[in-house]
């Protein structure tokens, strides 16, 4: 994903083995089939290409202190649960059971492209999140008011 960015929203079903098909439009943004999955902040999963994860986790580790309780919480919730997986020949992403449980992934999933990473949501949980986060979205757009569009 060096030059290309992840974008779009894609509905896919998790198969009985815990695998999720990676959409063709997202595959072109990958330069490597190794991906790192971890718990995200809003009860979903983040998916990073391996090189992007290395940069992201290094930045977190460089700023975190084991003597600072909030830093330990970030390390425990973002770094510790991270697992590397390799896409199979059919471009399926295996989601380990512990991560499926964290994000409540059973069947109906949504894959979101967030430019530098992907999010994987349970579809119903994402709809609920959208309803709950409208005020945050509006506040966030106000921080972008200096953009020239």
Swiss-Prot record:
- Which organism's genome codes for this protein? Treponema pallidum (strain Nichols)
Q: What is this protein called?
A: Transcriptional regulator MraZ
Q: Which gene encodes it?
A: mraZ
Q: Which CDD domains does the annotation name?
A: MraZ_C, MraZ_N
Q: Which UniProt keywords apply?
A: Cytoplasm, DNA-binding, Repeat, Transcription, Transcription regulation
Going by the entry's taxonomy, the superkingdom of the source organism is recorded as Bacteria
Q: Which GO terms describe its biological process?
A: negative regulation of DNA-templated transcription initiation
The SpoVT-AbrB domain sits at: 9-52, 82-125
SUPFAM superfamilies documented for this protein = AbrB/MazE/MraZ-like
Q: Where in the cell is it found?
A: Cytoplasm, Nucleoid
Q: How does it assemble?
A: Forms oligomers.
Got a GO cellular component term for this one? nucleoid
The Swiss-Prot or TrEMBL record describes its family as follows: Belongs to the MraZ family.
Q: Which GO terms describe its molecular function?
A: DNA-binding transcription factor activity; transcription cis-regulatory region binding
